[in-house]
Amino acid sequence: MHCRSVRYASWSAAALLWLAAIPAPAQITVTELQTPYSFISSQSGKDYFISNVNGEPDQADNNGFITKLDANGKLVSLKFIEGGKSDVTLHAPKGMALVEQTLYVADLDTLRAFDAASGKPVATIAVSSGSAPSSVRLTDVAFDGKSILYCSDQKANRIYRVELPSQKVTVLVTDPVLAGPAGLAVHPKSGQVIAVSWDKGKILEITPEGAVTELFSNGFFSSRFTNLRGVDFDRWGNMYVSDFTTGKVWRMTWDKRFQVIAEYLPSPGDLGIDRTNNLILVPYEYAHAAEMNGLETPSGSRSKQEKRTLADYGFIPPPPKPPAEGAVKK
């Protein structure tokens, strides 16, 4: 289990409860993030990137920027990539994905590509569903590890497929059941696309052919999720999702157990998992901040620290308490 924890904070008091993290002796604070949306790492775990909308999420104001951190979580450049500077166009950067040394960024109706080492623009991919490109509003992008990027359009209930290196864009699926697809991830083992729903708090699986299956949804008597923003997986196949409105980060284990690993968070956004270093990366949009924390390493033995269960949140009835020793049964 990692003992490294790096916190970026611009708020004075935030109630944070990381149930699976270890307190760390070192902290680094950055107070100049502006509406951070997404937080990702390179595959090697040596570079980290945070997208900053810096204003209205749908406005073409060319003032968005990307923050870069080094392997130790220290600031390399607050505005490593900045809209309006050095021939860069970047309006409201949201979700990101790294393909080798190329950083792809969802920016309104365009997928922009930058060199991850220099920050220089290398490609611009216009995304259109056949209607006016300006109607497209991309929220996230995910890479399948081979040659395909997937992009979500939350407002249109649509997911796009982008082929590399040809940059051919097609609509993978448009379906109301997606209910505002915000965050995307590709399952590291199955290769299926996972989308989380902003409108109805659903988690969905989409095949490479575009077939949609609901994995988790709120029931009539229980509502686990409200407005889901981010999703990613650790190296063991556990899924992590952020609930923007309730301020919680959930873990769904491979055997479908639900665990709240953090709560009372200020607007947790499009989270990422650094699988190399076993870290969780969470941006806080309204707090203009972001945080890195170590994740618990799965173990065959039971942890000495009692973890919270679904019973604590009313999702399943708690097991009956055993009778006191020596009690007389009637």
Model-derived features: positions:
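A short beta-strand motif characteristic of beta-propeller blades
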Residues: 27-30, 75-87, 120-132, 168-174, ...
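Beta-rich, blade/repeat-based domains predominating
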Residues: 33-45, 56, 61, 84-101, ...
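Short, conserved, GDST-rich strand-edge loop motifs in beta-rich repeat architectures
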Residues: 50-62, 289-300
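Short glycine/acidic-enriched loop and turn motifs that connect beta-strands
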Residues: 54-58, 110, 156-157, 200-202, ...
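WD40 beta-propeller blade core
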Residues: 67, 112-113, 160, 204, ...
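Short loop/turn segments that connect beta-strands within beta-propeller blades
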Residues: 70-74, 115-120, 163-167, 207-211, ...
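Blade-level signature of beta-propeller repeat domains, shared across WD40, Kelch, NHL, RCC1
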Residues: 268-318
